Amino acid sequence: MEKKMKEEEEEPLSPMARAFQEPSIDCGIVIKFGCKTKINPDVIVDSLKLNVFKHPRFCSLLDDDGTKWLRTDVVNVEEHVFVPDIDPKLTEEDVEWFVEDYISSITMIPLDRTKPLWEVHILNAKTSDAEAICVIRCHHALGDGVSILSLILASTRKTSEPEAFSTLPVPKCRESYNHRRGFSFFRLVLVVCSTVRLIWNTLVDSFLCMATIFFLKDTDTPLKGKPGAIKKFSHRIVSLDDIKLIKNAMEMTINDVLLGVTEAALTRYLHQSYDKTNEEAGTSLTPNRQDLLDRIRLRSLIVVNLRPTGSQSIADMMAKGSKCRWGNYISVILFPFTIALQSDPLVYLSNVKSMIDRKKNSLITYIIYTFSEFVIKAFGINVAVAFQRKIMLNTTMCISNLPGPTEEVSFHGHPIAYFAPSIYGLPQALTIHYLSYANKMIISVAVDPMIIDAHKLCDELEESLKNMKLAILEKGLPNHVN
């Protein structure tokens, strides 16, 4: 009995959690909520007092060497909730700048390790798309985006049905070859070919991953920065129905559409950046220079959730032996973008579709996760972090996509207008997070403001989506939304 109590009080950090809290990375998560009403801080504090002890990570401390969670029976919630004074004379535009600067400033201050590693910041000021802002900041060692989002959604209810929990989109199951009728020999050939392709793709991806660790670097562009810079956080809300329209017309997934939009936006942003540089220098974009732009190597780390399905219930994640797993159960894909202006915006979608289909037919995500755990156990956390940091330094950006509630939700009487998750601590100058919410898609960007114009990049992402929608409508492609 005594041993069991000690195990509950002391829990080892997972290998990925240990990596995230190392000083050379020290990665954190920020989630910005836009509320449709002013936020009552007392309601938030009372709710936290009732729920914080239900979730072990949020009432635990890191031990001195950062290898174990130590359960604490005392959490002073008031010390975790901050309500800064905001000048009531500020305009909506000024408030939006204030919110961006405020979030940037708090991410530069390390979380206090003498208490659980989370904070809540309440900004009761009106912006263009919300009456008030709530910012949750926590350490990535507590869990990945799926874990934290699942925890937050467990505390929300549907605005239309105050007693009902929020619902998430259910992934559609694809029909397996095993359930299709046909000549058995033909099915056998398909299985053999598919297996060979899977092995080949995995070997190629493994080689590219190792090459990136040791020598393969992305081209230096106006999107590639240096580690240690302060991050600026911005977001843009677009129509999820527009994305679904493109998805159905092009017969692809929402993830495919978002990658196509990203490739188009990055291309537009880079070409305009180089055009501006040439104008300032009094030169033109020569054919040789154009050829150089077309040969840019620009890769993103796409974060992949390794759980069986998308966001999980907290009960499932906390259950011992569960396959859902609370914590940092994620891996990455190395995804190359093609930087070339296209007269037809739908070409961007075709480009990413062929590449992501090949990446899906590979075991590289599981190999990277298993390899990271092996290196930590065999050679120590410093070697593993050095490898992870090298991959991030030699690539340009990071992308994540999370499914959110299918209907509007409220938190203890506060209807939520949007969720905007992001991350800080990575050495890359750019991260993009996509999150669906009701009939919206929220695009969140975190950038090094000395290198990248966050608002300009958001403009390009929004414009690229509009161009693709117009191209679909002009070509008369089937455009039903579901």
From Swiss-Prot:
It comes from the Eukaryota. The chain crosses the membrane at residues 196-216, 329-349, 367-387. It is found in: Cell membrane; Endoplasmic reticulum membrane. GO terms for molecular function: diacylglycerol O-acyltransferase activity; long-chain-alcohol O-fatty-acyltransferase activity. Keywords: Acyltransferase, Cell membrane, Endoplasmic reticulum, Glycoprotein, Membrane, Transferase, Transmembrane, Transmembrane helix. SUPFAM superfamilies: CoA-dependent acyltransferases. Its EC number is 2.3.1.20, 2.3.1.75. Glycans are attached at residue 394. The active site is at residue 140. Coiled coil: none annotated. Residues 217-328, 388-482 are lumenal. It catalyses: an acyl-CoA + a 1,2-diacyl-sn-glycerol = a triacyl-sn-glycerol + CoA; a long chain fatty alcohol + a fatty acyl-CoA = a wax ester + CoA. Pathway: Glycerolipid metabolism; triacylglycerol biosynthesis; Lipid metabolism. Mostly expressed in stems and siliques. The keyword Acyltransferase applies. GO terms for cellular component: endoplasmic reticulum membrane; plasma membrane. It is a single-pass membrane protein; Multi-pass membrane protein. Gene3D superfamilies: Chloramphenicol acetyltransferase-like domain. Residues 1-195, 350-366 are cytoplasmic. GO terms for biological process: triglyceride biosynthetic process. Bifunctional wax ester synthase/diacylglycerol acyltransferase. Involved in cuticular wax biosynthesis. In the N-terminal section; belongs to the long-chain O-acyltransferase family. This is Wax ester synthase/diacylglycerol acyltransferase 9. It comes from Arabidopsis thaliana (Mouse-ear cress). The lineage of its organism: Eukaryota, Viridiplantae, Streptophyta, Embryophyta, Tracheophyta.
